[in-house]
Amino acid sequence: MKATIIIPNINGKGWLKDSIESVYAQTEQDFELIVVDNGSTDESLEQARSYCSRPNFTLIENGCNTGFSHAVNQGIARAKSEFVVLFNNDAFAEPQWLAELLRAAESDE
């Protein structure tokens, strides 16, 4: 596995699904996706749960808001790859985003 993508989430109902879909639309598919939910009270936790059957998808459910840094650190602790990428729950990635990011990370320049 080349990369772990971590999405911390709290009440991202309006964006989370599209954000996750943009990750799964990447041309580079050698990644795992970890969503860390920080006690969402909207429907975004249910949106995240709908991906649990996908390979290389992990959902960490915090019952309350443990804070952004703690959520990110939880994701990092579960990462199985050399490279870890933080991705906001309201961000949308172009299809080449991960491939280009990994190319830059792996280059000698």
Where are these regions (language model features)?
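Cell-envelope/extracellular polymer assembly enzymes that use nucleotide-activated donors
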Residues: 2-4, 32
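Acidic helix N-cap motif at the loop->helix transition within catalytic regions
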Residues: 17, 42-51
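A conserved acidic beta->alpha catalytic loop
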Residues: 22, 37-46, 64
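Short, acidic, metal-binding catalytic loop of nucleotide-sugar glycosyltransferases
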Residues: 22-30
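Short beta-strand/loop segment that forms part of the nucleotide-sugar
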Residues: 31-39, 58-62
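Glycine-rich, basic loop-to-helix element that forms the pyrophosphate-binding segment
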Residues: 61-79, 89
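Short aromatic/hydrophobic "clamp" motif used to bind/position activated sugar donors
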Residues: 84
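Conserved donor NDP-sugar-binding/catalytic core segment of glycosyltransferases
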Residues: 95-109
